C-alpha cells in the first residue's frame, strides 16, 4: 500500500484494503490460506461475515504462500471447482462424500438469499445494492 496505515498513505488503505471495503463485495468468496497467513486474513473474513457475504475459509497447515504440497494443491483445485459449480451452476459434485462442505455452503446460500429478500422487500425501502 506504499507505507503504513496512517499519514500520507492512509488513503491507500481506505481505498484498497479488502477489509475496509468489504461492504462493496456481493459475490460469494472462497478463502484459502496457509497457517502462517491465516491470521492476517481473519480481519477480511470477519468483515465479509459482518456484511452477510457468503464466505468460506480454509487453512492448509504447514504450507507456503502458494500451495506447495501436492495433496493441498489437489484439495484446493477440487474445492475451487466445487465452489464455482455450486455458486455459478447450482450443482453439487458428489455431495455424499463432501456432505460437510455442501451443508455449510447450503447454509451460506440460504443466509444470502434471506439477506437479499430482506433488502429487496418493500419495507426495506430502496435497494441497498
Identify the residue ranges that each predicted region occupies.
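Active-site-proximal cap/loop segments of hydrolase catalytic domains
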Residues: 1-129
Amino acid at each position: 500500500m506504499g507505507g503504513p496505515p496512517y499519514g500520507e498513505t492512509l488513503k491507500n488503505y481506505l481505498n484498497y484494503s479488502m477489509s475496509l471495503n468489504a461492504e462493496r463485495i456481493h459475490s460469494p468468496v472462497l478463502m484459502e490460506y496457509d497457517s502462517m497467513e491465516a491470521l492476517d486474513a481473519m480481519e477480511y473474513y470477519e468483515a465479509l461475515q459482518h456484511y452477510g457475504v457468503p464466505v468460506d475459509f480454509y487453512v492448509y497447515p504447514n504450507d507456503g504462500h502458494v500451495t506447495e504440497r501436492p495433496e493441498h494443491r489437489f484439495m484446493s483445485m477440487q474445492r475451487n471447482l466445487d465452489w464455482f459449480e455450486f455458486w455459478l451452476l447450482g450443482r453439487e459434485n458428489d455431495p455424499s462424500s463432501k456432505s460437510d462442505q455442501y451443508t455449510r455452503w447450503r447454509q451460506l446460500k440460504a443466509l444470502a438469499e434471506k439477506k437479499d429478500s430482506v433488502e429487496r422487500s418493500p419495507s426495506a425501502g430502496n435497494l441497498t445494492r
